[in-house]
């Protein structure tokens, strides 16, 4: 937003793990990027206090109401990514549920501004905290990944194919393995397909670490299906993958599957939009709000329906007349990303 950039400078406090995401802003005179040591909490707290007290900071986003945050509450703009602990409480332990509820009650009980990433989240706020005092702004976001996707050269694509042994057509499932990401419906759909002898010449590619500290028994259930004789030859578990490599994998997939049960505003879908990819998308309300014309909705609780949707989409992708549609037009995707970013910043 040009009006904001003329009036304010931004100081971004970033942990080292995510610092490279913001490299593209280093040349912007209005953006000051500061990487902190996330392992030293005391040092970070002192740095934050010094920055806010003496650095002329007017607003703090997204402020957390911890001991430091409470000192600067008047400057705070809050953000709650989603209300998963309310919609899917069975995925959380009692201690974590209590902690999240305490934080959300403190934020929603304040008259500070509250940013939410979707109108679906705004409806949840009204449903779960009808007496809230915060002033709400819904601000959608895009994936600003133009530098990363432009770094995907034919040479990089070839090296990624060789590194991860991606010789066959494949379908990509990019999420981390939290239970709410709902990989179980995907692996059960794969099992249905392969038992019937369909898509045996396809690979199903997963990235992210096969862990969920909240629900280890869920991971055991996933692992049992993935390692079964029926599906193991067609499943590739790549683990944690570097960001540009991940985008190269997405770019060259036949299509993407996103079966999640809860999202605030899905980054996977925004990435896929920039690459102009076809996405099979769970039909949860936020996805219905976020989808574009290249999305196909399915019931996230019905593996047989998903299996049929995958088979039908794969058949369409194999037809020469649809080759360009499934390859994706990255230039068009980048243009759409900028258009949407302008629209969101004016909202």
Placement of each model-derived feature along the sequence:
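Carbohydrate transferase catalytic cores enriched for Leloir-type hexosyltransferases
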Residues: 1-347
